[in-house]
Amino acid sequence: MAPGADIATLHDRVRETIGAFSFDDRQQRSIFERDFKGLFDLVKLFLISERDSYYGYFLMAMKLELDFESNAVAGIKLNEYPPVFLANPLILGAFSLKEMLYIVCHEIDHVVFNHPAEMVRLNPEGDPVKYELFNLAADASVNDRLNDESCGIQSFMEMPQGAITSDSLKQRFGLKRILPLQSYRYYY
């Protein structure tokens, strides 16, 4: 991270690098990793110092792991200590800064609401259909809550286009009535 780089400048640099990224250029990859990790450190500090939210404190207790090969934007691995915030920086870094903050908070809320353990409990056989349905339900629960918060004090974040909400579940499954701001159990 360049000395004195602010979060917006570093985010812009990460996004510019994504557009020209080459897996074959080891020096570029090294610089990109450094910049992305620096950006992530600034995200932690922003969430703590500017927003005094538990999200930043949660991130401080985690290790960042970058996976350039993953198809997933981000996730949290709880089977390691300290827990790992796993991200594909080429995907996560391409979002706007407000969307990136939303995604980080989204992943943390899955842990706060114990969704990983609940998924294992409800789907011990690892059925992929149940896994997908659980993810939809858990995402709707988390995103509705984040959207409700973002109307006020949490306006520093913005839901990415296409994110799952109770409204999108209503449309996807042709439901006549569905309540917002419910737990995953309601949507599952």
Range-by-range predicted roles:
Residues M1-Y102, I108-Y188:
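Short, functionally important secondary-structure microenvironments
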